[in-house]
Amino acid sequence: MDSGKSSNEDMKRAIRWEVFIPAYLVVAVAAIVGIVNKDMLTKASNMFFFWSLDSFGWLYQISIMASFVLVAFVTCFSKIGSMRIGGKDAKPKYGFWTWFAMALTGGIATGIVTWGVNEPVIYFGNVWGELNTLGIEPGTTNAAIFAMARTYYNWTFIPYAIYAMCGLLVAYIYYHKRGSLTVTATLKPLFGDKITTPVASAVIDTLSMLALTIGLATGLTMCITLTVTGLKSAYGIAESLPLFIGIGVAIIFAFTFSTYVGLDKGLKIIGSLNAWFYY
């Protein structure tokens, strides 16, 4: 009883309410607005997205290419690349294919299934008008080359360079510097202790949680939509809101359960099954 109580108290202390509550409120408000007035949420989201793209698009590109260069060259062709996460005597907890399955299904699984076919067709047909800025005629050989190149840029080395960079930073700080599993901890070597003040760390980690939550929500929505349309195409099951909600609840339950039982019994098995079905 005492150990259980102590464990519960530790769990309660582990929840950073100054991070959880603001992020939860933002997501909850967005969800309520989406239910009450979907068009308003869509318009506001698009305005923010295009504003950020116009204002910080250059920074996105620099950050992306910096991640690719650092991961591909610095970590692979320098002494840093030979460093073993966890110490020189550390052993891998899982085999290569298990890690591969978890990385694939946790990284681009839903996105690549959805956009792996759609995106080349979109660029080939100039649906988004990108070919107009390059002087390429839609439906031509050059358009096909551009479409495939753009799709590979979006879904292969570039995104995984970003994931690898973030993962390596967090892992290095946690295992070698004994820091916390937070984005704030990865910034401490650059900005010093001032970045770890309660206010600064709360703001940074709240924004990080929002980015993760919104990203997961996007992937979840794509997954549900893909499943619903697949059921309609294969079995003639009509699309409906109850079906959409039911699939969403099932996916959330599976994810929550896999998180609760731990990496060994949860994500490892689900990721391996996903990868097996995928291939």
Predicted features along the sequence, with ranges:
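Helix-loop-helix module between adjacent transmembrane segments
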Residues: 10-14, 18-21, 25-35, 68-73, ...
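N-terminal alpha-helical transmembrane segments of multi-pass membrane transport
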Residues: 1-140
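Membrane-interface helix-loop-helix junctions at boundaries between adjacent transmembrane segments
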Residues: 121-157, 236-243, 257-279
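Membrane-interface loop-to-helix entry segments
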Residues: 22, 53-56, 63-66, 204-212, ...
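Membrane-water interface regions at transmembrane-helix termini and the short interhelical loops
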Residues: 5-13, 38-53, 73-91, 146-154, ...
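Generic hydrophobic alpha-helical membrane-segment signal
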Residues: 97-99, 104, 144-147, 155, ...
